[in-house]
Amino acid sequence: MNLSYTDEQNLLKDSVSKFCTSDYEFETRMKSVNSDSGHSDDHWRLFAELGWLAIPFPEEMGGLNGSDVDLSLMFEEFGKSIVVEPYLANVVLAGGILRRSDLDSKSEHIEALVSGEKQFSLANYEPNKGFNLDNVSCEIGEDGKVSGVKTTVLNAQNADSFIVFG
């Protein structure tokens, strides 16, 4: 069993590491944290330009068809510099739900996410429910109106669209 990284994975790791060590010093990160969005819009655009937002999505949706190992390499480097951009909330969580959805417009939404044009937020957590989606109190009416409470909606302040479990 070969547990070595591929050449592409080593390039990805080096690319993320270089960003984290050259463009993400403490003062820059604190400026981002204290901004209205809680992250750097310039860094988010750079993530899109570098193809990082496309990694977990299939090629037919504008993605790079990356693997969980690719994501883990990125998160290892992100963790070293405490990267605050909403990659987990936007790309992995909300993007993962979009990718697996049966929405007619999912490709359009994912292409907007991959390009950095749109951000999404997953609203699935409810008070006293933990991560259990089998017992959701929130209701979504036929008119699309949401009735109920969601908590810990990651990336809510930046979201162009919300994915709500009801």
Task: Give the label of every model feature segment.
Residues 147-166:
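A short core secondary-structure module
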Residues 116-127:
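A short, Trp-centered hydrophobic/proline-enriched beta-strand micro-motif
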Residues 66-67, 132-134, 155-159:
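Short glycine/proline-enriched turns and hinge-like loops at secondary-structure junctions
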Residues 83-104:
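N-terminal glycine-rich flavin-associated loop
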Residues 98-102, 141, 164-166:
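Short beta-strand-to-turn element immediately C-terminal to the catalytic PLP-Schiff-base lysine
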